[in-house]
Amino acid sequence: MKSYPIILIVLIIFFGLSSCISIKKYNEQRTTCISPDQMKEDVDFSYSKLKEMHPQLYWYISKEELDFKFDSLKRTIKEPLTPIQFYFKLQPVITSIREGHLALRIPRKKFTKKEIKALEHKKGIFSRFEYYIKDDHLYIIKNNDSIENIKPGTEILSINDIPVSEYIKKYKKLINSDGLNTTFQPYFLKDVFFNFYTAEYGVNEKATIKTLYDHEKKIYTLKREAKSEEDLKKDKAQEKRTAERKINDYVPLSDSYNRSFKFLDSDKTIAYIKVKSFSQDYSSTFYKETFSKIKTANSSYLIIDIRNNYGGSLYEINNLYSYLTSEPFSLIKPSQVTSISTPLKTNYFRKSNPFQYIFKSLLYPTYFFAQSFSTYKKDGSVYYKMRADKPTKPNKDAFQGKIFVLINGGSFSASSIITAKLKHDKRVVLIGEETGGANDGTVAGFYSYQKLPHSKINLPIGLLLVKPNIQFSNTKRGVIPDIAITESMQDIIENKDPQLDWVINEIEGEKKAKQFPPTSKDL
């Protein structure tokens, strides 16, 4: 019995060393050039896997056009490239499919646990700012640490002597929304800009930026500073999972909550729910408690804010919808897959350490049995069984008043699914911008993670065609708001919210009209 701890220690050391060797091998491969023939094989592999598993590959691009793009790409590959250089050639072709969920994973450098711990004890260079992108311009809109006293509204003209416009033009080609709308790209690009940058240039200790503010140009050298003891204590405190943090889905990285609720007036007639991500974690408890409070307060108006919400759980939006309707409903149509074997292509053992691999192996027969009976055929197509396409009853605390929903280009995936359904059922007034996700559905659900044979780049392929249960618009666009109101950079800097302000003013106008109805003389 006493030998078990020793064996366990030996195994931990063994697997730790194996992990370090694996990381070293990966990083070496990442900087090693691949031959043109090998890259062309990776191109063919990518396209063949997309045709095999993607259930709506030619939704926004014809087969002839996509064939041409892949063939043209292969003709441009004439010299050896590193995996990351190859990524910047292949990803724009993947982007042309115009499916926002479909993207190669950029081959970033991997770090050992020791290196990760060292980085955790330092502040980031670029992550301490918040950004805004318009056209080919990048602006700082928030400087929480007052670094170099850089003012909100400052434009970054160059990074390490390379114009920012060049980065933006290059990185724009790597991302896309669902379909033909253009609202998603600036929202998503501002969030991933420095992910692309650090993948391309590494995690460095300093960077030089040239800026423009109020017609004055300045040069700053940003450095990766060590965190103070107070910073480290704050990091540790943020990791604690209190009951409130669980229910509101606390995010330590941003020191904020994914879900929040409040009344916007003293008499509690206006309820406000903000959801930054449909993460599902403790969401049932959140909505149960929230709508109980709204019902008790007898609120007349509800505002749901899903701006900058990139989506998430179908279960959560199905549950949320049950609080917004008085009739039984089916949120989505049956979800199509390419074949009955598709559910078994989801990389069951992906990212499993040796211990998890052993545990999952024991459970695999159950998983295999469940997935094997998870599909059915109808009218010549194959569908995956989903709870969200079954009839759902309205919740007993369902809101019966007037509902406003705030949307913008950052409303994507599940946010667009629920928005499209609410608009179709005439349950809400939509305020803001066209959503970044498509009105008529998307391809996501769960993924098959394919690794390209030579470059080792990962290609996650969505396996489910998920469509809201509506009459489709067939416009290849996002969900269009009833009232179009945009938010400027200056609005954000000054903490103004023209979209929410419009709703509040509309509600106040309705309240006054009810309080002082027009008399026969007025008419």
Feature roles, as predicted:
Residues 19-302, 306-337, 348-349, 439-451, ...:
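Flexible, low-complexity junctional segments that flank or bridge functional domains
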Residues 154, 296, 314-492, 506:
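Conserved acidic, small-residue-rich alpha-beta core segments centered on
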Residues 1-27:
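Bacterial Sec-dependent N-terminal signal peptides
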Residues 6, 392, 518-519:
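Generic low-complexity segments that are intrinsically disordered, proline-rich and/or Lys/Arg-biased
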Residues 12-15, 106, 426, 504:
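Generic low-complexity, intrinsically disordered sequence content enriched
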